[in-house]
Amino acid sequence: MPEEGSGCSVRRRPYGCVLRAALVPLVAGLVICLVVCIQRFAQAQQQLPLESLGWDVAELQLNHTGPQQDPRLYWQGGPALGRSFLHGPELDKGQLRIHRDGIYMVHIQVTLAICSSTTASRHHPTTLAVGICSPASRSISLLRLSFHQGCTIASQRLTPLARGDTLCTNLTGTLLPSRNTDETFFGVQWVRP
């Protein structure tokens, strides 16, 4: 008859089976908790508003122009208007007010209504200016553009803006801006502190 085993008995720890039986579900539970936490964190990040991520941004469309004596352009923004939005900055009587210090990209495009290259040169000088109009202590011109012989001008620049700065846009001359949102728009984007 063949011999079974070596004849030496190996003592097993009585809690070994219990330890194995408890360890497997514990590790599995930790892995499941980790996966669930990562998924919830990713969902929370996707649902954060742009302001909390550090993105102050606005894209505005022309609302209306003031009286003939007032060269100021008034803007509007919001999701009900289509591609127009405000995240961070706000509108104050049609002018854009900044809520966070930093370097911003300011951009604008204005197309003159009922314009051809010959009418643009006849009504020279028609000028568009963008500047900080309030507070008065920080009043400064940021962009000044002439239409010369064209009907559309567009420009952008990086500039430092401070909390409370209000940006104003002025159109001097006899021609009016187009209300078409593809032709006339104004916006800012926070770039860095």
Curated annotation (Swiss-Prot):
Cytoplasmic side: 1-17
Domain of life of the native organism: Eukaryota
Phenotype upon changing D165A: Decreased protein expression
Positions of the THD domain: 56-191
One GO term of the biological process aspect: extrinsic apoptotic signaling pathway
Pfam families: TNF
GO molecular-function terms, A-Z: receptor ligand activity; tumor necrosis factor receptor binding
Sites carrying sugar chains: N63, N170
Stretches that traverse the bilayer: 18-38
Membrane topology, record value: Single-pass type II membrane protein
Effect of S146D: Loss of CD27 binding
Keywords of the record: Cell membrane, Disease variant, Disulfide bond, Glycoprotein, Membrane, Signal-anchor, Transmembrane, Transmembrane helix
Disease linked to the protein: Lymphoproliferative syndrome 3: An autosomal recessive, early-onset immunologic disorder characterized by increased susceptibility to Epstein-Barr virus infection in B cells, abnormal B-cell proliferation and increased susceptibility to B-cell malignancies, including Hodgkin lymphoma. Patients usually have lymphadenopathy and hypogammaglobulinemia, and may suffer from recurrent infections.
Protein known as: CD70 antigen
Source organism per UniProt: Homo sapiens (Human)
Source lineage: Eukaryota, Metazoa, Chordata, Craniata, Vertebrata
